[in-house]
């Protein structure tokens, strides 16, 4: 026991103490000195709750999922926190069900009779069918709410990464050609209320090659002084780490000739850091001066910021050389000759999107203008607004501010319209398909009510003989079906909410080499769970209409004929 970490020890002691204290208290308050089923359930919930508190406290002492190495202990602790949290919520809901039924029994005639039917313990097979109906609705509601949360998490994660690596609004020409008077456009855009940043950009497609491989990339010429006001490039840089400004090597490529030995030049997929290592020993005096100069100080090259996946593809690190080859070169005796220029890797970034990390590279604006032979020109102006969700509302203001018919203004939704339309359609289709599970589960409620009507035929006849109307019998059986569906929905939605909230808080690690994300994204939306709850209750309510009408149409003479 002494080898256990302190949080685990505290959690175990707290769980045992809470469970024992609760059991003793129940025994002292129980006049007959007998443990009731409800008391034991409450005691178990208290113990599970104490375990959850212990695991939750322990998870806060673990290293973060992002950028840390995978360990079995960390995953077991996080899984323990999620499981105990879910069990505590489910146990609490189950413990509250008798109290809810008690309140229904104190209500009108329909709710009183319906609650008595649901909690009847002498029905045998009918009670089993009711339990299966509750379980079916709970399982369908749980799967629907969980799937919606996971899909919403992936959609939110994708949107966050797109907004972090792209401008909220892009200004370019309709012919997608370069233009020069961009300084005036930037000043006019920055004057628009709601715009927080604007920066010029030059884009072009080239081929990047190293000594071992090559890949097609998109070059972005950026202004290092203003790029941070629009995208999160500086935040996404993972190497180098020793310099204060992550783009220092890009702005001052001469620093790449003397990288410190302890500087991080690359990050592995598991979070391991690769450093430059010690410098070469001093060269001998007998070495040729020209050779010694080349070995001692590598030639000065412009800087280039590349993504992690591109660095893996080209097998390069910070300080290594990369050659860019453009098909749009100079005209020579043999025709158009490709333009080649050597660069040196100034930084490696990780955006979280494979498409960006494998195909996007950045250099300075002046260097890109020189390489693509467009001096003093840009291909676009990137704009960031204070509220990305309402970027489409600012687009007309930006259009009015620049007053240029030859320029087009598009927001991020318009640029990625096909992607987000597909995600929305997929979300709706998933909701409709999984809603079929609730419809199938509602058939169990129909069977339960029909069996209930057959078993309670005598009771229905007596109630009608005493003055109960067809409407009251109809409301009774509909209320009974709604109670069964409501209990199942409450259990399913609460379990899904507890599980998804736990996964969102404590995290579920995924292999970044396979999924390119280090944890399962979860988006817990109150609106989504409200829609799932209303959909389940509505479907279950509709399912009660037919058996309730059958019960209401039963004549007293038919119910008492064989009595």
For the regions a language model picked out, list residue spans one by one.
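Membrane-interface junction motifs in transport/secretion proteins
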Residues: 151, 155-187, 203
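N-terminal Sec/SRP start-transfer signal
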Residues: 93, 97-140
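A structural signal for hydrophobic secondary-structure junctions
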Residues: 183-356, 362, 369-374
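Short helix-loop junctions at transmembrane helix boundaries
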Residues: 2-10, 52-86, 490-531, 545, ...
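C-terminal membrane-exit region of the final transmembrane helix in multipass inner-membrane proteins
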Residues: 20-32, 97-102, 106, 525-563
């Amino acid at each position: 026991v002494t080898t256990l970490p302190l949080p685990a020890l505290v959690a175990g002691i707290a769980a045992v103490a809470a469970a024992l204290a609760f059991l003793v208290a129940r025994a002292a308050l129980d006049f007959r000195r007998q443990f009731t089923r409800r008391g034991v359930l409450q005691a178990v919930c208290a113990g599970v709750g104490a375990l959850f508190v212990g695991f939750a406290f322990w998870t806060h002492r673990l290293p973060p999922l992002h950028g840390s190495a995978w360990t079995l202990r960390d995953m077991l602790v996080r899984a323990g926190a999620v499981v105990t949290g879910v069990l505590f919520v489910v146990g609490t809901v189950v413990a509250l069900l008798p109290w809810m039924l008690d309140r229904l029994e104190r209500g009108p005639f329909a709710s009183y009779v319906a609650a008595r039917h649901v909690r009847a313990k002498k029905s045998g097979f009918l009670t089993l069918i009711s339990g299966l109906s509750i379980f079916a609705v709970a399982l369908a509601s749980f799967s629907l709410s969980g799937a919606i949360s996971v899909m919403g998490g992936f959609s939110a994660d994708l949107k966050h990464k797109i907004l972090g690596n792209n401008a909220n609004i892009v200004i370019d020409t309709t012919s997608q050609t370069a233009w020069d008077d961009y300084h005036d456009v930037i000043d006019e855009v920055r004057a628009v209320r709601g715009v927080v940043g604007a920066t010029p950009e030059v884009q072009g497609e080239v081929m990047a090659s190293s000594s071992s491989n090559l890949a097609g990339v998109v070059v972005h010429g950026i202004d290092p002084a203003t790029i941070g006001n629009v995208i999160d490039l500086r935040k996404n840089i993972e190497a180098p780490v020793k310099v204060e400004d992550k783009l220092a090597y890009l702005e001052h490529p001469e620093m790449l000739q003397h990288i410190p030995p302890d500087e991080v030049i690359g990050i592995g997929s598991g979070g391991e850091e690769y450093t430059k290592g010690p410098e070469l020993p001093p060269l001998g005096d007998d070495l040729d001066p020209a050779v010694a100069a080349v070995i001692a100080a590598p030639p000065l090259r412009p800087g280039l910021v590349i993504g992690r996946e591109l660095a893996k593809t080209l097998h390069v690190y910070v300080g290594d050389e990369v050659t860019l080859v453009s098909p749009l070169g100079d005209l020579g005796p043999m025709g158009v000759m490709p333009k080649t220029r050597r660069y040196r890797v100034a930084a490696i970034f990780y955006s979280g999107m494979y498409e960006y990390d494998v195909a996007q590279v950045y250099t300075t604006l002046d260097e890109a203008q020189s390489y693509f032979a467009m001096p003093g020109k840009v291909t676009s102006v990137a704009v960031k607004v204070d509220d990305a969700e309402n970027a489409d509302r600012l687009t007309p203001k930006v259009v009015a501010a620049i007053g240029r018919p030859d320029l087009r203004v598009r927001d991020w939704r318009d640029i990625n319209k096909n992607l987000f339309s597909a995600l929305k359609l997929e979300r709706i289709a998933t909701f409709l398909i999984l809603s079929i599970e609730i419809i199938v589960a509602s058939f169990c409620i129909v069977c339960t009510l029909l069996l209930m009507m057959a078993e309670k035929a005598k009771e229905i006849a007596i109630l009608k003989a005493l003055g109960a109307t067809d409407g009251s019998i109809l409301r009774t059986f509909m209320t009974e079906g709604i109670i069964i569906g409501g209990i199942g929905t409450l259990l399913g939605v609460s379990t899904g909410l507890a599980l998804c909230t736990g996964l969102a808080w404590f995290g579920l690690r995924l292999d970044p080499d396979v999924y390119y994300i280090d944890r399962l994204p979860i988006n817990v939306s109150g609106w989504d769970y409200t829609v799932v709850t209303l959909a389940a209750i509505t479907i279950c309510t509709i399912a009660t209409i037919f058996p309730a009408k059958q019960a209401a149409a039963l004549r007293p003479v038919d119910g008492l004929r064989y009595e």
